[in-house]
């Protein structure tokens, strides 16, 4: 890919032996090298089967994967960067070149703000997770400082609501909770949203049950398994996720 020599190339090692500095890359060449490296890494981090797996779990169509919010959530679950995920989608013929350019024009910071990752709640460098029915029983590796939006559809017109089955883990702080209807029609389905921030290390479960508040039994249950650790400096996000999962003895969800 015409990259400049890496630190382990023979030429650089020979220069180091004579206390000479390795050549530096700057400007557009550096930017291009970063893009190429990102795309190359995506070949290993984002094989087609992994994209298909998460798309099927969440019911994401090919059209959904042209939306930056969906691509960002896919990237989080695959442990890859947003940019690498965009390139992988094109490489696997899920999007075309024009869509790739449109997606790359959008910065992850803008996407986070759209899903509720406001500056007052968390730093923009942290991730903004949106969890729904497709993440049921999934083992999710979260970093301290990340925000979590739980987004669940409910049949409020029939009296069924998503209710927290038990308090959230102590490492999470609940910041907000809201209900919005999908239409003005009487009895229309609604969405329950709960907004959290990961403030400390820890692991635990975030469980909900779909039930009428006055009834004992639920008609459905959902739980998200969370592993929250501080970011490991010097490691890529993908390696941090794998390391956290190995420590907790969990598999990628």
Spans of features found by a protein language model:
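Conserved binding/catalytic microenvironments
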Residues: 1-106, 253
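Residue-identity detector for glutamine
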Residues: 20, 33, 56, 73, ...
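Extracytoplasmic soluble-region selector
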Residues: 128-253
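A general structural signal for short secondary-structure boundary/capping elements
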Residues: 8, 16-22, 119-123, 196-198, ...
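Pan-zinc metallopeptidase signature
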Residues: 62-167, 236-238, 250-253
